[in-house]
C-alpha cells in the first residue's frame, strides 16, 4: 500500500498540468536500499546454523556411527531429533520476540546454538552428543522463526520477496559449508573428524553475535511498543525516500490500532492483542481471512518437508552409494556438488521472486520436483534389480538428485519462508510464523528419522515414488489455496485471504482500486477497501 501510494503521488504530480515528453519515459525501477539488505544478511546468519547442521550430519553420521559403534536406528534418531528439539525454540520464539524484540531474539538464537555446537564437538559419547543436539536444536528453532519475521518487517514492499528469501539462501550456504567441512575433515582420525565437523558450527554464531550490534530493531515491533520516534528513524534508513518511510509508518500504525493523529515519539498502544488473545484470534476464533492464512502457512510448511527434501540432502551419500558409487571420497564430492547446485539456484530464485511472482515459481518448482523424484525412484529401482553397476542408471540417479535440489531451491525452498512470514497480520505474525516453523520441524524430523526404515520397508526407489505422489497433492494444494502476494503490502494481505479459490477477485480489486488525487482531499492517496 505504502509503496503504491508513493508511486501514485509522484505520477499524479507529473500529469496534473501538461504532458511532457519525459512523462512518457519508462518508469524507473525502485532503488534497492543497501542498509535494508545489510540488516537482512545479518539477521539471516542464524539460518546458516541449521543449514550447516543438515549438511555436516550427512557425512559426520558415518564417522559417528563407526566411532561410537551405533546402530542405524540410533543414527536416524541423532540426525532427526534436532528438528524435534527445535520445536521448543520456535514455540518460545514468538513470545520472546514480542517481549525482548526481534533483534535480541536473533542474538539469543546465536548464543544458544554456539553452546550446543561446542557441546557436540566435545561430546565423549552418544548421550552427551544427544544433549548437545538438544541445546543446538533450541537455538535453531529460535533462528528459524526470527530470521524471516525480522527480514519481512524491515523490508520495503517492492523488494520484500528478494530480501525475505535470504533465510533460505543462508540455509543453503550452510548446507554447502557442511558438505565442504565433511570433505575437509574426512582425512582426520575417525574419533577427531566428526568432532571437528560439528564443533566448527559454533563459528557462525560468533559472527552473528558481533554483527547484530549494527542491526536496528524491527520498525513494526517498535510501533507495537508505542515507540513511534524510533520506528520512524529505522524506516528512514530502510526506505528509498522520506515520503515512503512516512507512508509505511502510517500503515503500521493503522495495523497496530494506533490513531493517526498520535505523532509523539512515545505513545500508548492498545493491549488487546497481547498474550492469550493472540492465540484466540489465531486458533480459537479466527476470522475467515486469518483461518485461510493459517491453512496456507501451515500447508506450505507441511508440504515443503513431507516431499522428502531432507531425505535427499541428509542421506545423499547413502543414495549415491546405493546407486553404485563405491568410493567414499567420490561420494563426498558428489554431495558437495549437491550443495553447490542448491546454493546457485537459491541465488537465482532471490532475483526472480519480485519479478515473476510467488505462484509461478512455486508451481514450476513443484512440477520439477515431482518429475525428478519419479525419475530418481525409477533409476534406483533399476539399480536395485541388477547385480552389476549400470553406468547410465548411476548417472541418472546423480542427475535427478541435482535436479531435485535445483527445483526445490528455485521455488519451494525460499518461497515457503517468504510466503508464510508475509501473510500474517502484524499482531499475529510472530506466533503465526512460530506455528509454521513448528510444523516444518516436526515433519522434517519425521522424514529424517524414518527414511532409513522407509527404504528398507518399501525399497529406496519406492520411497522416492512415495515422495513424488505426495508432491502431486502439494501441487494441487498450492494451486487452489495460495493467492499471489507479489507487490502487496503486509497490511493488505487480509484482503487477499478468506475467499479461497476466489482470491483472484480480491487481487483484481486491489490492482484496479482508484486513488483520489483531488486537491484538498483529506484522504488523498488512501485506498478504501469497503
What are these regions (language model features)?
Residues 239-242:
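Short helix/loop segments within enzyme catalytic domains
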Residues 248-255:
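Short amphipathic alpha-helical segments embedded in low-complexity Lys/Glu-rich regions
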Residues 2-236, 247, 260-530:
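Transmembrane-helix signature of 12-pass secondary carriers
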Amino acid at each position: 500500500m505504502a509503496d503504491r501510494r508513493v508511486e501514485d503521488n509522484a505520477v499524479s504530480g507529473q500529469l496534473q498540468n501538461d504532458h511532457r515528453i519525459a512523462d512518457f519515459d519508462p518508469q524507473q525501477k525502485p532503488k534497492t536500499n543497501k542498509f535494508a539488505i545489510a540488516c537482512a544478511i545479518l539477521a539471516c546468519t542464524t539460518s546458516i546454523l541449521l543449514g550447516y547442521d543438515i549438511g555436516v550430519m550427512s557425512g559426520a553420521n558415518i564417522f559417528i556411527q563407526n566411532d561410537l559403534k551405533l546402530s542405524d536406528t540410533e543414527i536416524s534418531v541423532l540426525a532427526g531429533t534436532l528438528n524435534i528439539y527445535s520445536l521448543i525454540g520456535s514455540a518460545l520464539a514468538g513470545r520472546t520476540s514480542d517481549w525482548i524484540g526481534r533483534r535480541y531474539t536473533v542474538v539469543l538464537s546465536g548464543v544458544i546454538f554456539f553452546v550446543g555446537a561446542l557441546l557436540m564437538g566435545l561430546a565423549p559419547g552418544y548421550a552427551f552428543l544427544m544433549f548437545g543436539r538438544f541445546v543446538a536444536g533450541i537455538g535453531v528453532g529460535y533462528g528459524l522463526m526470527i530470521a524471516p519475521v525480522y527480514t519481512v518487517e524491515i523490508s520495503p514492499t517492492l523488494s520484500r520477496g528478494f530480501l525475505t528469501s535470504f533465510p533460505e539462501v543462508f540455509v543453503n550456504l550452510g548446507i554447502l559449508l557442511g558438505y565442504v567441512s565433511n570433505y575437509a575433515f574426512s582425512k582426520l582420525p575417525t574419533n577427531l573428524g566428526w568432532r571437528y565437523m560439528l564443533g566448527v558450527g559454533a563459528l557462525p554464531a560468533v559472527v552473528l553475535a558481533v554483527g547484530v550490534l549494527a542491526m536496528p530493531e524491527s520498525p513494526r515491533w517498535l510501533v507495537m511498543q508505542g515507540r513511534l520516534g524510533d520506528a520512524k528513524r529505522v524506516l528512514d534508513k530502510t526506505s528509498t525516500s522520506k515520503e515512503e518511510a512516512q507512508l509505511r509508518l502510517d500503515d503500521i500504525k493503522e495495523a497496530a490500532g494506533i490513531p493517526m493523529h498520535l505523532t509523539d515519539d512515545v505513545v500508548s498502544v492498545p493491549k488487546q492483542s497481547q498474550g492469550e488473545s493472540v492465540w484466540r484470534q489465531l486458533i480459537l476464533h479466527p476470522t475467515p481471512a486469518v483461518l485461510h492464512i493459517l491453512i496456507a502457512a501451515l500447508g506450505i510448511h507441511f508440504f515443503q518437508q513431507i516431499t522428502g527434501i531432507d531425505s535427499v540432502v541428509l542421506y545423499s551419500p547413502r543414495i549415491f552409494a546405493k546407486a553404485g558409487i563405491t568410493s567414499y571420497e567420490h561420494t563426498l564430492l558428489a554431495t558437495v556438488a549437491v550443495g553447490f547446485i542448491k546454493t546457485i539456484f537459491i541465488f537465482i530464485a532471490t532475483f526472480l521472486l519480485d519479478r515473476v511472482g510467488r505462484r509461478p515459481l512455486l508451481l514450476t518448482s513443484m512440477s520439477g520436483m515431482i518429475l525428478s523424484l519419479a525419475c530418481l525412484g525409477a533409476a534406483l529401482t533399476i539399480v536395485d534389480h541388477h547385480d552389476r553397476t549400470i553406468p547410465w542408471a548411476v548417472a541418472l540417479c546423480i542427475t535427478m538428485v541435482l535436479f531435485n535440489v535445483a527445483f526445490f531451491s528455485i521455488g519451494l525452498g525460499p518461497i515457503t519462508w517468504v510466503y508464510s512470514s508475509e501473510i500474517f497480520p502484524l499482531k499475529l505474525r510472530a506466533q503465526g510464523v512460530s506455528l509454521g516453523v513448528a510444523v516444518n520441524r516436526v515433519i522434517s524430523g519425521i522424514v529424517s528419522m524414518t527414511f532409513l526404515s522407509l527404504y528398507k520397508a518399501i525399497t529406496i526407489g519406492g520411497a522416492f515414488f512415495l515422495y513424488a505422489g505426495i508432491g502431486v497433492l502439494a501441487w494441487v494444494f498450492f494451486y487452489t489455496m495460495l493467492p499471489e502476494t507479489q507487490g502487496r503490502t503486509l497490511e493488505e494481505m487480509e484482503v487477499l485471504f478468506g475467499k479461497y479459490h476466489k482470491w483472484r477477485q480480491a487481487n483484481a480489486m486491489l490492482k484496479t482500486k482508484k486513488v483520489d488525487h483531488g486537491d484538498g482531499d483529506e484522504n488523498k492517496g488512501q485506498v478504501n477497501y469497503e
